[in-house]
């Protein structure tokens, strides 16, 4: 797992009703593929490989929102990814159980992104 100390510190300071869910999302991303790195961008955890893959913003209070910046470019059909725009997709997790239930599909999304970036 490519855990970034800056992100760990950010999470330690986070006062949010869904902090455990946000932490579970982070763990799921980092466990999905060893190529994934993380940082803080736009005041939220951002997951990267050959560019920004997704950010997990703490603004929503009823779910942990994950914005896949260029989600429309991720190869394959992924029910986890929602949205119809030209570029972005998003996923929402209401609780830790929903993160765990979506963990395998999230890993598929992450690997598809990483593989597509390696393929050029």
Stretches with model-predicted labels:
Residues 1-120:
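Charge-dense, helix-prone N-terminal extensions
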